[in-house]
């Protein structure tokens, strides 16, 4: 039976609301290229209504309903959301798979992580209560001082299409835990599950206006959200180019932003590895989520002593990856998200060949799949560091390869990038791994693995991969401001000026 896409409206002030201009955007299943539904298209007019709803939510009952409520109150809602997501896991995972092309097993894993992330931030919300009025030791006895942690206000959350609900959760859960009111704008290429999050919030009775969800195009909904004077912060995950535009818009209002942007992450494989273990992690690091991961380890830097043997084995692993409709049992590589992304990736591969690189494996549509935006797992060798394929993010199932002869050369190649999100090193020599992990210019380093992610650990990059950290306690701090409160406690007058009474 075909999976039905629920027909939803925008979610504003706790209610479903038709877009002011009544526009909608078709949903295309990337595995079949068929239209399977549509989503509402918000514009600046809807952003205005959502911002007003969010500001009212913060001010309601002088803030006591949400922003100034005990963290334990907000935690109850977060736990209710987590439970409802877990209850609807199977249904939501299927919607995710047909909307963005992610293999169903991966989508189900994502939904588990969504539920776990809401639970985690429920715990941190409760912990906030104990952190209020933290005393500060001062050098002058006449004063005492403490710190308050307060929500930053109304936040705009702009999220990508590769992990539609999970990436939204990485922002929504800590923002709500902190006591902010949020406006979520997911990517127009994959918004279905974010609208289901709205339905979950409605079911659990989340106070109106605390979370508003606007689907729509970036220039029609995302841009007016980023530049709105009554939005106190923007958190964005997406391309470096769009991140730069958001920074520019926010700069006009001196508005804080946190950005998780592109990557061209390296995986360094030394010559002492177990070939099969290292080959599987190398494949997982680039072909998981159909290669559409900001942190994908898309540059393989392999020791020359084992390069030929390793690549032969890696090709065998790639040929064993089941490429299929995401709902098909055992699927491990689905289609990329859209026709535009499909064409862009094929152009990257063509340019690599024209610049002198060699496609060792893959590089085209799988022969057995005539429809859908499918691309084989692709390995490209004979790469130079000046080539586009080495320098630019592909965001697809494409791995480029270079060899090295020394640790210093490996590090030079690994750090030869404008990006600095993730990096991996694989070796049995753990002292070497520790040394290399310190030298890698990245916000996340994996040792003897690639891509594991836990909501307890910080996530974010350096260089053009952005700044700020999501997840863990760092993710909560993204949505909090710190207020110093200092009191004069001496009975004596301050005594700096001569008292008029003594003149």
From Swiss-Prot:
The active site is at residues 260, 294. Disulfide bonds: none annotated. It comes from the Eukaryota. It is found in: Peroxisome. Na(+) binds at residues 28, 99, 189. GO terms for cellular component: peroxisome. The record marks 162 as: Transition state stabilizer. Gene3D superfamilies: Aldehyde Dehydrogenase, Chain A, domain 1, Aldehyde Dehydrogenase, Chain A, domain 2. Keywords: Metal-binding, NAD, Oxidoreductase, Peroxisome, Sodium. GO terms for molecular function: 3-aminopropanal dehydrogenase (NAD+) activity; aminobutyraldehyde dehydrogenase (NAD+) activity; metal ion binding. InterPro entries: Ald_DH/histidinol_DH, Ald_DH_C, Ald_DH_CS_CYS, Ald_DH_CS_GLU, Ald_DH_N, Aldehyde_DH_dom. Pathway: Amine and polyamine biosynthesis; betaine biosynthesis via choline pathway; betaine from betaine aldehyde: step 1/1. Pfam families: Aldedh. Expressed in leaves, flowers and fruits. It catalyses: 4-aminobutanal + NAD(+) + H2O = 4-aminobutanoate + NADH + 2 H(+); 3-aminopropanal + NAD(+) + H2O = beta-alanine + NADH + 2 H(+). CDD domains: ALDH_F10_BADH. NAD(+) binds at residues 238-245, 294, 393. Optimum pH is 9.75 with 4-aminobutanal as substrate. Belongs to the aldehyde dehydrogenase family. Dehydrogenase that catalyzes the oxidation of several aminoaldehydes. Metabolizes and detoxifies aldehyde products of polyamine degradation to non-toxic amino acids. Catalyzes the oxidation of 4-aminobutanal and 3-aminopropanal to 4-aminobutanoate and beta-alanine, respectively. This is Aminoaldehyde dehydrogenase 2, peroxisomal.
